[in-house]
Regions:
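Bacterial N-terminal signal peptides that target proteins for export
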Residues: 1-8
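Short, linear, compositionally biased motifs with a strong N-terminal bias
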Residues: 11-14
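Early exported N-terminus immediately downstream of N-terminal targeting peptides
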Residues: 24-105
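Surface-exposed, polar/charged faces of alpha-helical domains
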Residues: 25, 40, 44-47, 51-55, ...
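Surface-exposed, charged secondary-structure patches
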Residues: 103-145, 197-207
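Short beta-strand edge/turn micro-motifs at domain boundaries
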Residues: 144-172
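Low-complexity, intrinsically disordered terminal/linker segments enriched in charged
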Residues: 162-207
Length: 207
């Protein structure tokens, strides 16, 4: 789970400008430009970000979160449990899950380099939703990982709802994990666990 999460979270950086990418579906230069901008921000603030998870979270909030439909993704993860959950529990899960991901894996942002991702030509129908943006992420050891961004939208509004690394879906992976946990302990306990995990990471930490 940890290795998958690391690949997926690094992959989210390729979607820092998905709305522009989604409209053209051939905007390699847009992704490259955005990646370079992000890389510059990290380079100029590296010391600050390295010691302050809250600053990392704010950077993620600004550059990445707006490009993802966390609510729709959370609904897909909870599946049938979303339908039976109260509105309050739905909201709590969306928030807790996002904060858990940032708290647990947010410091991977520090290792992002623009030359580690390559966006492939779009081979689908831009008029149909969902659409897939195919990319290749190069890991530190040189391994190339095929990563697809599954996007839903239309017109000028496209947002990421799932990421698949080598065919392994972020949504399906967490759905399988949480489905077992919910069956044993209930949704409320899962939400509390996510909240506790997110809160257990200090706002200022080097990991």
């Amino acid at each position: 789970m940890a290795d998958l999460a690391r690949v997926l979270l690094l992959a989210t950086l390729a979607a820092a400008a998905p709305q522009a990418l989604a409209q053209s579906f051939a905007g390699n230069e847009i992704v490259a430009g955005t990646a370079a901008e992000l890389s510059t921000a990290i380079a100029t603030r590296h010391a600050e970000l390295e010691n302050d998870l809250e600053a990392i979270a704010m950077l993620v909030d600004t550059l990445i979160l707006p490009r993802f439909d966390m609510r729709r993704g959370s609904r897909a993860i909870l599946a049938e449990h979303w339908d039976s959950a109260s509105p309050t529990d739905r909201d709590r899960f969306v928030t807790a899950f996002y904060e858990y991901l940032v708290a647990t894996y947010g410091d991977l942002l520090l290792y992002f380099k623009p030359d580690t991702l390559r966006v492939l030509p779009f081979d689908g129908d831009a008029a149909n939703s969902p659409a897939r943006v195919h990319t290749i992420i190069t890991l530190n050891d040189g391994t190339e990982v095929d990563v697809d961004f599954v996007m839903i939208g239309g017109g000028g509004e496209w947002r990421v709802v799932d990421i698949e690394a080598e065919g392994v879906s972020y949504v399906r992976t967490y759905r399988s994990q949480f489905r077992v946990d919910i069956a044993v302990d209930g949704l409320g306990s899962v939400i509390e666990w996510l909240e506790q995990k997110a809160a257990s990471v200090p706002a200022s930490a080097t990991r």
